[in-house]
Amino acid sequence: MSIAEPILLTPGPLTTSARTRQAMLVDWGSWDDRFNQLTASLCQQLLAIIQGADSHHCVPLQGSGTFAVEAAIGTLVPRDGKVLVLINGAYGKRLAKICEVLGRDFSTFETAEDQPTTAADVERLLQADSSISHVALIHCETSTGILNPLPEIAQVVASHGKRLIIDAMSSFGALPIDAREIPFDALIAASGKCLEGVPGMGFVFAAKASLAQAGGNAHSLAMDLHDQHSYMAKTGQWRFTPPTHVVAALHEALLQYAEEGGLPARHARYADNCQTLLDGMGELGLRSFLPEAIQAPIIVTFHAPKDPRYQFKDFYERVKAKGFILYPGKLTQVETFRVGCIGHVDRRGMQAAVAAIAEVLQEMEVLDI
């Protein structure tokens, strides 16, 4: 795997292939039939990843993944609905903030940052509050890399007749989610994560029946997924100026995704990256924050060294000078830093990153790990 520096060991934006970057060198007319066909092909390929063509629509939206999350909640949760937000990290808290800003009634259930929400938790919460209409959760909480038990939670939500909204930003394309087996109203992801496109486009897999009933719910013209889908279905076009180069890059990235072997192969490479990282960092004495049983192969949080000579900014700049971009920690209780396992990188790239980190710690004379 040929990789250009710097290598972004982050959860997105991430390192992309030369072919993906090359795809952005062509300009597209936003109303041109060829571009409309590109968008339609993109949505078909995305739906195929979740086996969702019969049950869900793929609604693309300009902007970051958070734009798409806000659009999904604003469109699919009625104004008199109530959302149970499951939280064990920063992105769950962001979900709650979105509900607050949109004026949707909500309650929260928060566990520690190293504790997944359980199906038993959700069962108890739904039994206690019949006014809840929707449950929202983060599949892979990017602030730590923790994986929440989606299939089990989805079954509990469905058994109570409630609707499920899944933020799968950091898992879609790498971890299996089958719409035929996991009932959900919305699953949200974005171009610049495990599909290895560039940032700038989110997309929502919305249950067909729920989206059809969602007219008038949205708080925003631009983020109205019901209107976005209706217009696209009628005209083949985006309502407002699309991110043409981002769409073209994602289309090319999906071709490479299929060539690699689709989700099983992408998952296998990321899992190998993750294990290579854990093994290598462990040899340096660096401890991961999560036990491996709940660690998703997306991003790994490591405890910062105890040595007072360790300062993250200096550490970051030195590792960057060796060709690798890391991610700061996002925990409130302990000092950490994060290393991503995703993007156009393989085992050799992860080994090189560990070697660079080892050199930097030696240069900084960090002895107390």
From Swiss-Prot:
Belongs to the class-V pyridoxal-phosphate-dependent aminotransferase family. PhnW subfamily. InterPro entries: Aminotrans_V_dom, NH2EtPonate_pyrv_transaminase, PyrdxlP-dep_Trfase, PyrdxlP-dep_Trfase_major, PyrdxlP-dep_Trfase_small, SP_NH2Trfase/AEP_transaminase. It is an enzyme of class 2 (transferase). It catalyses: (2-aminoethyl)phosphonate + pyruvate = phosphonoacetaldehyde + L-alanine. Keywords: Aminotransferase, Pyridoxal phosphate, Pyruvate, Transferase. The keyword Transferase applies. Pfam families: Aminotran_5 (PF00266). PANTHER family: 2-AMINOETHYLPHOSPHONATE--PYRUVATE TRANSAMINASE. It comes from Pseudomonas fluorescens (strain ATCC BAA-477 / NRRL B-23932 / Pf-5). Homodimer. One of its GO terms (biological process) is organic phosphonate catabolic process. Its cofactor is pyridoxal 5'-phosphate. NCBIfam families: PhnW-AepZ, PRK13479.1, transamin_PhnW. This is 2-aminoethylphosphonate--pyruvate transaminase. The modification N6-(pyridoxal phosphate)lysine is found at residue 193. Involved in phosphonate degradation. Its EC number is 2.6.1.37. It comes from the Bacteria. The gene is phnW.
